[in-house]
């Protein structure tokens, strides 16, 4: 997807990391040596292209909230071709501390098995969505301390209103 976007003249910053499945070691190395903050400082938002399936737009994962507003805005932009949901640990858990981030399905199933399969027809559609997002999507970013740090459980709500 990234190479095709570059071939089509899109201007994008990208990170290729390793070891996401073993604790996000690659992205954490970038974070530890302060490279990550510098690299994504000018980025309006981040889309992690590493989610199994065909139609997930993750707004949270591994107990970390990424950005539900960005996830829903991207779903709307793609014509509801995706659905907002949650997942497990990913590099997005780290990236969301630096800019609004989501994790997007990229048309594969049965990851890391002998039965891993890619739906190339759907992958092309997703590539077209990503290029559309890069070239046409307008999003006004919110500082990360505003969107990701406050969560409310139903219990908090009841206590606040005296129930």
Predicted regions and their residues:
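Acidic/histidine-rich catalytic neighborhood of metal-dependent amide-processing enzymes
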Residues: 1-69, 84
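Structural element of the ATP-grasp superfamily
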Residues: 2, 74-75, 94-95
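Amphipathic, non-transmembrane alpha-helical secondary structure
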Residues: 3, 28-31, 93, 124, ...
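His/Asp/Glu-rich mid-to-C-terminal helical/loop segments that flank catalytic regions of hydrolases
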Residues: 6-7, 110-163
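Generic secondary-structure signature for well-ordered alpha-helical cores
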Residues: 7, 11, 32, 76-79, ...
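Hydrophobic alpha-helical segments
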Residues: 32, 64, 104, 119-121, ...
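Gly/Ser/Thr-rich active-site loops/lids in small-molecule metabolic enzymes
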Residues: 66-76, 122-130
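Zn-dependent metallopeptidase/amidohydrolase metal-coordination segment
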Residues: 81-126
């Amino acid at each position: 997807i990234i190479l095709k976007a570059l071939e089509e003249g899109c201007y994008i910053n990208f990170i290729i990391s390793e070891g996401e499945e073993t604790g996000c070691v690659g992205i954490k190395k970038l974070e530890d040596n302060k490279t990550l903050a510098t690299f994504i400082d000018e980025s309006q938002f981040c889309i992690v292209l590493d989610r199994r399936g065909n139609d997930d737009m993750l707004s949270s994962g591994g107990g970390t909230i990424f950005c539900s507003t960005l996830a829903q805005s991207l779903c709307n932009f793609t014509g509801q071709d995706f659905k907002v949901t949650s997942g497990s640990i990913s590099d997005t858990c780290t990236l969301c501390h630096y800019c609004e981030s989501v994790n997007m399905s990229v048309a594969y199933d049965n990851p890391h098995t002998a039965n891993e399969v890619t739906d190339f027809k759907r992958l092309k559609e997703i590539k077209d969505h990503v290029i559309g997002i890069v070239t046409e999507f307008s999003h006004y970013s919110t500082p990360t301390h505003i969107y990701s740090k406050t969560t409310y459980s139903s219990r908090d709500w009841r206590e606040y209103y005296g129930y």
